[in-house]
């Protein structure tokens, strides 16, 4: 088990993570992690944003849904750049 000490940095408390643990989780600075308390334990784990395929995203859409006034305005607006429609 690795141990570390909580340190005050400005108005926050910092938890330093030993390099061996970062390497084991393929983490580095500026990576996002999730934190949760479970039975009195702080659990920190890598946060990976879900990756969806186009098919998965389209499966969530209702092709019969009504178009809102805002969407209709956007669809009817003239091209403003080099769009090809």
Swiss-Prot record:
List cystine links.
none
Instruction: Identify the SMART domains for this entry.
Output: SpoVT_AbrB
| Keyword annotations of the record | DNA-binding, Plasmid, Toxin-antitoxin system
Q: What's one Pfam family the UniProt record gives for this protein?
A: MazE_antitoxin
Pinpoint the SpoVT-AbrB domain residues: 4-49
Record InterPro entries: Antitox_PemI-like, SpoVT-AbrB_dom, SpoVT-AbrB_sf
Q: Name one GO molecular function term.
A: DNA binding
Sum up the protein's function in the record's words: Antitoxin component of a type II toxin-antitoxin (TA) system. Labile antitoxin that binds to its cognate PemK endoribonuclease toxin and neutralizes its activity. Responsible for the stable maintenance of the plasmid during cell division. Both PemI and PemK proteins bind to the promoter region of the pem operon to autoregulate their synthesis.
Q: How does it assemble?
A: Forms a complex with cognate toxin PemK.
What does the sequence similarity comment in the record state about its family?
Belongs to the PemI family.
Q: Which protein, by its recorded name, is this?
A: Antitoxin PemI
Q: Which organism is it from?
A: Escherichia coli
Q: Specify the taxonomic lineage.
A: Bacteria, Pseudomonadati, Pseudomonadota, Gammaproteobacteria, Enterobacterales
């Amino acid at each position: 088990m690795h141990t570390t000490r909580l340190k005050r940095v400005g108005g926050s408390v910092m938890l330093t993570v030993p390099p061996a643990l970062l390497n084991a989780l393929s983490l580095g600075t500026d990576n996002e992690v999730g934190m949760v308390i479970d039975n009195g334990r702080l659990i920190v784990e890598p946060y990976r944003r879900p990756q969806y395929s186009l098919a998965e995203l389209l499966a969530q859409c209702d092709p019969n849904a009504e178009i809102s006034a805002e969407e209709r305005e956007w669809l009817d607006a003239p091209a403003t750049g080099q769009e090809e429609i």
